[in-house]
Amino acid sequence: MADDTTDTKSSNQMWGGRFASGPDAIMEEINASIGFDKKLFAQDIRGSIAHATMLAHQEIISAEDKDKIVHGLNTILSEIESGNFEFSRQLEDIHMNVEARLATLIGPAAGRLHTARSRNDQVALDFRLWVKEELQKTEQMLTGLIAAFLDRAEEHAESVMPGFTHLQTAQPVTFGHHCMAYVEMFGRDRSRVRHAIEHLDESPIGAAALAGTGYPIDRHMTAKALGFREPTRNSIDTVSDRDFAIEFLSIAAIAGMHLSRLAEEIVIWSTPQFGFVRLSDAFSTGSSIMPQKKNPDAAELVRAKTGRINGSLVALLTIMKGLPLAYSKDMQEDKEQVFDAAESLELAIAAMTGMVRDMTVNTARMKAAAGSGYSTATDLADWLVREAGLPFRDAHHVTGRAVALAESKGCDLAELPLSDLQAIHADITDKVYDVLTVEASVASRKSFGGTAPSEVRRQIAFWRARN
């Protein structure tokens, strides 16, 4: 598709009745948005068909003109989809490009399409439709990512790994439990997507420039035809509103943050020093100089995409923060932020779904690491509370002394002789060794939401029923 043509017709002929001369070339360049808003062509045509149909139903235009308009719009849709439509920068935007082509195809009837409509409510409609469709796509992609994690969680409900705080070994958990943490995160993202769809499910068309219209239009009819729950309730707010776009970017930023945290863990886990996972060749690259390298570039790029998404959110918030009601041309700068963030988010979710699905998990390496760093120290403290009757703070102190002794001897807690433990606290018996293995530690964490395999499987069943 060409971005520009050499025609001399411009949008000035659409709106320039009170102007004595045409715009400067620089004005045309800064004013034009067709380079990016042509992405809205399907939504623009769909909205125009619904509008024309309503106008005819209300006898504002004739049925004959409506039929010409609808046929012409469908012809334009086919031309754009097949790559046979020439977009003109002189015509500013997608609305004027479509209308100019419609006039060429069907003549004067094309001029009736814009009855009871402004580009202000037209672009609000097009953009809202596009964002709604993108949210629906995001919901489906998040569902796929959640499914990939559920499969890995089920596979590894009993696979022990170290749990971390401050990136230091904390307590043993299962890899399945760790996977389910991401299910919860991406489940919240999906819930936010669903709420956002609910928030924007109102049709802007019919608000006109800002005050509504004197024509007897039926906004409920167009809302229903376009798949909206109802029309918007205030015409000024309708053309002023870009909350739906900001909400999309907010959701994208939060989801991107979750993806970035996951990407960071994958990058760390795939290092030889950790060796917890091995990424498939399909989601790795090599080095141009070091033949041995297998780089987690997909994960690193997912991590980087988050920065772009965050930038888009801040950009649109900044664009909107000082605008008086109703429409201002500043709002033309809304779309590129959303388009770019949507593309980044789609790529990131797709890449992460593939990585999670295809990566190889080194359970032996994880289990070995789970026992390092005195990860069962909390289990010793809990045993002292249960079996020796110590207050937890006292048990914490006793356990700290045991850890210090083990460190000085270069051994694990379970390797300390009973005599050494009894020298720290006389009530310790040989039964304490039953809780000092990583398997026993994990199995004991049966509290709701805990890491015990039985609890992980309950969590998986809960999410399977909702995915």
UniProtKB/Swiss-Prot annotation:
An annotated GO BP: L-arginine biosynthetic process
GO molecular-function terms, A-Z: argininosuccinate lyase activity
Enzyme Commission no: 4.3.2.1
Keyword 4Fe-4S tagged: no
Group of enzyme by EC: lyase
UniProt entry tagged with the keyword Plastid: no
The organism's place on the tree of life at top rank: Bacteria
Keyword tags: Amino-acid biosynthesis, Arginine biosynthesis, Cytoplasm, Lyase
Name of this chain's protein: Argininosuccinate lyase
Organism from which the protein derives: Rhizobium johnstonii (strain DSM 114642 / LMG 32736 / 3841)
